[in-house]
Amino acid sequence: MDRHHHHHHHHHHHMMSGGGQDPAAGDGGAGGATQDSFFLGPAAAAMFSGAGSSSSGAGTSAGGGGGGPSPSSSSPSLSRYESQKRRDWNTFGQYLRNHRPPLSLSRCSGAHVLEFLKYMDQFGKTKVHTPVCPFYGHPNPPAPCPCPLRQAWGSLDALIGRLRAAYEENGGTPEMNPFGARAVRLYLREVRETQARARGISYEKKKRKKPSSAGAGAGPSSEGSPPPPGGSASGGGDTSASPQFIIP
């Protein structure tokens, strides 16, 4: 008994010496969470889901937290919009690093941004029917078809809004901003029209009719829902406003 007590005391002492470490361990736990979510950023999965599912992914994680404390405690300073913006910026940075021939941010043009958006399509989750498909123009196709999956227009629009802001936050000038290039705006408009026709949906109607319900209620279709409240002009600004509005 005595010996056991001694052993216990020793163990306790060890824990106390670790006691200085215990808060650190707790801290490490939170740090682990922070680091984990940071690690997720550049990691393939989060990147690949890109703009498309990340908006719904962010929705689920925030919703899953439910209480709010857990998501916010892991990253107290960053809103969902800010952390998504950082992830997108990392994704674009990685795209530049892997680019052949090498491409620096300063030499990046609207054409390169379009190249990046087309590259992101391979990680999209939105089926866009081709005109020869029997389901072309059907909002809810009754059966599977071989049409390609793409990034939804709303995802690309929000992605460009975030990257446009990140570019200027990282020292770029507005007049040099490749994400604000006319070619990019025209491309987004074209994608919106193409997808609206292919999927048999109208973005215009949605935009006016239910900005609030689309933001709050449309969980599964969150791919398309974040952008409608803001036009493509202020897509970035609005996406930043709406998630912060939803979380509290």
From Swiss-Prot:
Q: Which residues form the ALOG domain?
A: 80-207
Question: Where is the sequence biased in composition, kind Low complexity?
Answer: 50-59, 70-79, 212-224, 239-248
One of the record's GO molecular function terms? protein homodimerization activity
Residues spanned by motif Nuclear localization signal: 205-210
Report where it is expressed, by tissue. Expressed in lemma, palea, rachis branches, flag leaves and young embryos. Highly expressed in lemmas and paleas of young spikelets. Expressed in stamens, pistil and leaf sheaths.
Under the heading PROSITE patterns, the entry gives:
ALOG (PS51697)
Alphabetized, the UniProt keywords read:
Developmental protein, DNA-binding, Nucleus, Repressor, Transcription, Transcription regulation
* Region called Disordered, residue ranges: 1-35, 50-84, 198-248
Q: Does the keyword Transcription apply?
A: yes
* Function of the molecule: Transcription factor required for lateral development of the lemma and palea. Involved in the regulation of grain hull development. Possesses transactivation activity in yeast, and may determine grain shape and size by modifying gene expression in the grain hull. Regulates the expression of cell proliferation and expansion related genes. Acts as a transcriptional repressor and regulates cell expansion during the lateral development of spikelet.
Assembly, per entry? Homodimer.
The protein depicted here goes by the name Protein G1-like6
